[in-house]
A protein has these predicted regions:
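A nucleotide- and high-energy phosphate-metabolite-utilizing enzyme signature
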Residues: 1-435
Length: 435
């Protein structure tokens, strides 16, 4: 099996003499390569697509050490410093190489059991935050070079972008994996009557909308190293029919008057990943206000249940007579735990506003327990189950396997009992009339 994984890689390497020389002169790198390819088909394919990553194998001490956020920022800054300000193609390529190198490091640490799952997810999330902050800064600089600076109410130029990147889903919940999309919402707070200072002047709102479009283009363009991240903006106000970049005022108005319950559920995991502290604070105030609104509990339960059933019908395992279990979408799986937590936050934040202070499921479960809303034993059960499920999703991602488990795998992993535990607690919280 290892040989099957390594052969395509060797074929890719044979096309470039430099890589052959690198491996022949660095037996340690070759040893690391074989180890990693043996452990993960994803790693083997990842390096095959980008043989430049072989450089990462030269120093095991570096390969198995994940830098902190400040070090990531410094490295990306230095990579881009060498590139002309108007060389977009090279900026995109260097940013992709940076992300790929660090994803490889994370995968190496995971498959060699150097770090636990939550450290890996935190790192992949920090990597995305660092990268998207740089993408935002580059897009702003390029827009300013073309159209000048946006202006405030006094027609004075605004030198830092009044722009937020809000992370939802896995990036908001600090749970990124190797191939995760980034669920993002872009928000601006440009003065509504203002326009830019350049000769080719733009309305402030149009300036920020084009800046958002530029950021998506930067991420999605296929270069030699592929795309950067797949950015999903469907959680923005009005979804696909909404503006790519919403004003802060429009975002607030939508959340207050037009958002569905599932959009408020999504807001539970939303957090700012890039933007000014002042604007971040304004967003957090809106989020807090929405999440702590008093809700009709039976109506909320019904809406959460209906949305969950719709997802199971569309995304879960079908026609398998219980012989398969979709780890994420089926009853007793990952999404049941996520919905259960989101229901708890929406139901009780009115009395317990501290529930809105964190966005990841592990700490949200702790917060629900600390508030006396969940039994400590149930919290422990859900946390252990959630971590077990997520560890298996990571393992399967690194082996390029589906999240659809056969019944023998479910039993071997001990997931039968875990599913039953989740289903029991789901019924306790969301179907109390049937419990």
């Amino acid at each position: 099996e290892t040989l099957e994984r390594v052969i395509p890689l060797l074929e890719a390497v044979l096309r470039r003499t430099a890589y052959l020389v690198l491996l022949s002169e660095n037996p340690q790198a070759l040893e690391q390569l074989i180890k990693l390819c043996s452990a993960s088909s994803w790693v083997a394919e990842y390096i095959t697509r980008t043989p430049l990553l072989l450089d990462e194998l030269l120093v095991p001490e570096t390969l198995y050490r994940l830098p902190d956020q400040h070090e990531l920022q410094e490295e990306l800054h230095l990579r881009l410093l060498r590139i002309e300000a108007d060389d977009l193609e090279q900026q995109m390529e260097q940013t992709r190489q940076f992300v790929r190198a660090h994803k490889l490091r994370a995968a190496a640490c995971e498959v060699m059991n150097k770090l636990p799952l939550m450290k890996i997810s935190d790192y992949l999330t920090r990597l995305a935050e660092t990268t998207m902050t740089m993408v935002q800064n580059l897009a702003f600089e390029q827009m300013v070079a073309k159209y000048g600076y946006p202006t405030d109410a006094n027609k004075e130029p605004v030198y830092t972008p009044e722009f937020l990147i809000v992370g939802y889903g896995k990036v908001g919940g600090l749970e990124l994996s190797y191939s995760s999309d980034l669920d993002l919402v872009f928000i601006h707070h440009g003065h509504p009557g203002g326009s830019t200072t350049g000769e080719r002047s733009l309305d402030n709102g149009v300036f920020y909308t084009r800046m958002g479009q530029r950021m998506v283009h930067f991420c999605s363009t296929q270069t030699r190293s592929g795309d950067l991240y797949e950015v999903d903006l469907r959680l923005r106000p009005s979804g696909n029919s909404g503006m790519i970049v919403a004003s802060l005022k429009a975002f607030k108005e939508y959340q207050q008057n037009h958002a569905w319950t599932w959009e408020h559920q999504a807001l539970v995991r939303a957090r700012v990943i890039s933007g000014s502290s002042e604007l971040s604070s304004s967003f957090n105030d809106i989020r807090q206000e929405i999440l702590t609104s008093q809700r009709d509990i039976p109506e909320l339960r019904e809406e959460v249940r209906a949305m969950r059933q719709k997802m199971r019908d569309n995304l879960g395992s079908k026609d398998t007579n219980g012989q398969q279990f979709h780890l994420k979408q089926d009853e007793g799986g990952i999404v049941d735990i996520e919905f259960l937590v989101q229901y708890g936050v929406l139901a009780w934040s009115h009395q317990h506003p501290e529930l809105t202070q964190v966005t990841d499921n592990m700490r949200l479960l702790d917060a629900l327990t600390k508030a006396g809303l969940m039994a400590p034993k149930d919290c422990q059960t859900l946390q252990e189950t959630y971590l077990s499920y997520r560890a298996e999703t990571h393992r399967r991602a690194l082996q390029k396997q589906s999240l659809l488990l056969e019944s023998d795998s479910v039993s071997a992993l001990g997931f039968d009992a875990r599913r039953n535990d989740v289903t029991r607690l789901w019924k306790l919280w969301l179907e109390p009339e049937q419990s």
